[in-house]
Swiss-Prot record:
PROSITE patterns reported in the protein's UniProt record: RIBOSOMAL_L31 (PS01143)
Cofactor binding note from Swiss-Prot or TrEMBL: Binds 1 zinc ion per subunit.
Family from the record: Belongs to the bacterial ribosomal protein bL31 family. Type A subfamily.
Name of the featured protein: Large ribosomal subunit protein bL31
Positions bound to Zn(2+): C16, C18, C37, C40
Record keywords, A-Z: Metal-binding, Ribonucleoprotein, Ribosomal protein, RNA-binding, rRNA-binding, Zinc
Protein task: Binds the 23S rRNA.
Single biological process term from Gene Ontology: translation
GO CC annotations on file: ribonucleoprotein complex; ribosome
Cofactor names: Zn(2+)
Stored Pfam families: Ribosomal_L31
Name of the encoding gene: rpmE
Species this protein is from: Buchnera aphidicola subsp. Cinara cedri (strain Cc)
């Protein structure tokens, strides 16, 4: 590897919209802002919602007059 051609890594902070701050190393020189992180994303927090598909399927069948085969 050649010397002195690679960008310098700096410690910056990524701040989420929920207020959580994550220290990371990057070639970027300024701090970053994130929309979601592991502290506020529904998948990681366990607050995710599941969609009730049965009602939607029944509505579709009713709309197009499908009967059970």
């Amino acid at each position: 590897m050649k010397k002195n051609i690679h960008p310098e890594y700096k410690k910056i902070f990524a701040t989420c919209s929920c207020g959580y701050t994550i220290p990371i190393f990057s070639t970027k020189s300024s701090d970053m802002s994130l929309d979601v992180c592991s502290q506020c994303h529904p998948f990681y927090t366990g607050k995710q919602r599941t969609m009730n598909k049965k009602g939607r399927i029944q509505r579709f069948k009713k709309r197009f007059n499908f009967s059970e085969i």
